[in-house]
Amino acid sequence: MKKHLTRLLFAALLLLALCIGASAAGTSGKCGPSAYWSFDSSTGTLTISGSGAMNDCVFQWGDPDPRPWSAYLSEIKTVVIGDSITKIGKESFSSLSCTTVRIGKNVQVIGENAFMNCTSLTGDLVIPDSVTTIDRWAFFGSVISNGTLTLGKGLRTIGERAFTDCSFSGGLTIPEGVTEIAEGAFCSSSKYSGSPAHGKITGTLTLPSTLKTIGAYAFAYEGFSGELLIPDGVTCIGANAFAECDGFGGTLSLPDSVKTVGEWAFYQCEGFTGLKLPAGLTKIEKLSFAFMAGLKTEVAIPEGVTEIGEGAFECSYMPSVRLPSTLKKIEKQAFMHTHNLTKITLPDGLETIGDEAFDGCRFKKAIVLPASIKSIGKKAFYGYSYYGSGTLGAYFLGAAPQIVGTLNANCSFPSDWTLFYLPGTSGWTGDTYAGYKIAPWDGETRWDNLLTREFGYGWDNKGNEIETSWSVNTDTGKVTLTDDLNEGCVVAVSYDAEGRVTSIGVLRTKKDFVILNLQDTCRLFLLNASSAPRLNTPITINDYLQT
């Protein structure tokens, strides 16, 4: 009997020891060669102590959560990484509902997916100066409500999508020493996901002088404001790098160190008012500067550029573009609907104009095509808006090129245009070419879409009705009335809001116009004279200067 009681007592003690051991193992344990974890359920605090690197916690599809603290995931509110820990393991704290993360002062590496989708963080997140590497997807989808992100001075590597879809305020400063922003490092998809968990970074963006490469989608769709200063030394800006960052303002000035600007790089950056391109470019990529609706100054495309890509400046609103002498090809839709362009000079050496390249533009001067042109695409100038009526057309300096869009079949030009050619150039035979009317020209006189009509009726100073016609040279500002008018003939000029001449003609009725100015024997008239500005550029009417 005594022996039996002894056995029962031993079994009870063993069971008690096992229970105590199991309880202790459940709230603490090892998580690295010399790293340990403990969870305090009363405060919801998970603490990583010890030293060195943590183990990686790599999830396998269908397997249980490999993290030793997996039983407490929903209870963890605070994560504290001890000062002697050097590496945070892969996926260690992903998808926690914690509100606070404190990273120890000797951590050097934050592993892949370490804090991915921690959407309940509040306050400020500080990455200490000891951290040199933030691996890919480390903070992907994490939200810092009403808080800021501070990146430590020792940081050198920011991995692919490290902070994608993060949300925090107060701006972002990338520390000196970082040479590359990896693909999608700070990208936001909130615009397309519709999820508030997919946040944006707000405030200013400061880039380091050490930066060399800005990866694809690096800052795409973010909510930055202020000016964007790209440091001298950056050589590559990846595709979509700043796409739809419409909060930036001022002039976007790309340093001459930049050799490559990827497709869609600054697509729909509507806040920029100016654009300076680097001297080292050889191609303007597809949609790289499209939909920059805020542009207000001329864009000069640098010498050395041979090709302007598809939609490169589509729907951007710069008032003028300067094309380089090295340009060979303008791809489809490159300048489609750039409504503020009033004129463009196509350089000698240009060979190809793609489909819809200038579709919907509103030039006020005639199009002159250099002798080098070999091909003009479908609807290249279709939808071209002009002011007034008359013999409108394109003026060719060389042989007849391939015109892909024939009349009434994806027209390359508006159907009422005439194609003017220089006598002696090849390919221009008969009365039509590609279905369009053709006619010779002298190489100088052009219809420039400034006149409301080519002839008109008016009144001389004695009340006699007269008829006249005219020609215009907009390069010199001289208008020539081709008929010998009586002394004192009345001439009317109309203006746009900026004081540019939009039409010139002879008066139909005396009472409909108000005298604005009188020079010698010619009178200058203007409709709605009370709101009319003065001319920006003087014009000459039959050698009488009008200002």
Annotate the PLM regions.
Residues N528-T537:
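Short acidic/polar inter-strand loop motif in beta-rich domains
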Residues S288, G377-D448:
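Leucine-rich solenoid repeat scaffolds
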Residues G26-K30, N449-T474:
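Transition segment at domain starts
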Residues G89-S92, G111-M116, D135-A138, G159-A162, ...:
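Consensus positions within tandem repeat domains that build extended binding/scaffold surfaces
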Residues C19-T27:
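Sec-dependent signal peptide cleavage junction
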Residues F10-C19:
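Bacterial N-terminal signal peptides
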Residues M1-L9:
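Bacterial N-terminal signal peptides that target proteins for export
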Residues T45-S51, L73-K87, S97-V109, T119-T133, ...:
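Structural signature of tandem-repeat unit edges
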